[in-house]
Each structure stands twice: as structure tokens, then as C-alpha cells.
Amino acid sequence: DLRKRGIRVLPGGDYGFKWNPHGRNARDLQMFVELFGFSPLEAIQAATQAGGELMGEPGRLGVITQGAFADLLLVDGDPSKDIAILQDPDRFLAIMKDGAFHKEPADNLAGQRVAAE
């Protein structure tokens, strides 16, 4: 196992082709869980935090902190328990790229969450 030897393993691939279109990288995270023994949270961290470190932007890319790039996905559910949630666009509640919403959360989203709990 590469990880046991201290080698970082990150998801990624050649996207943008007919047989592997953009937007399918969440499928790779599920493969990391099912085939490589990652927990869902480890797969998410490999794709985000470790990816930011690999790209030379530790602390700014792949993390949620003040001063970091604001690229966020808010989903209905807990992907740390069920990684497949990230493959279901119907569960995407909000999408933010560079601090701008590409899909804004519903106005009543917070109220629905509080009422459900």
C-alpha cells in the first residue's frame, strides 16, 4: 500500500473527453473508498487539502479558512459518511467558485435545516 509507505495518493485524471467528461471526479473519490481503502473523509481530503498542497497553494487551496480561495460545494447529506452524495447534482444546495455563487442556496434552506433537527 503506497500510503503505508508515506506516499501521497491523490485523485485525478484526464477529463474533458467523450468517454470521461468534466464533472466526473466525484466518481474517482468513490473509487478511492471502494478500491483503495480510503475512508470517505480521507478521499475528500486527498482531493482538496492534499491537492492544494500539491498545487503549491497550501492553506489557500483545498481548505476552508480566512484568506483561502472560496471554492465550496454545499450538499444535502454527509459525504464523510456516504461519498456517493457528491455524484448527485440534485443534492447540491450551493456551489461557490472564487467567492461567487454559481448556484445560490435557497432562501429558506437554513430554516428547513433547523426545523428538521
Descriptions of predicted regions:
Residues 116-117:
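Short, solvent-exposed mixed-charge patches
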Residues 49, 66-112:
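C-terminal cap of metal-dependent C-N hydrolases
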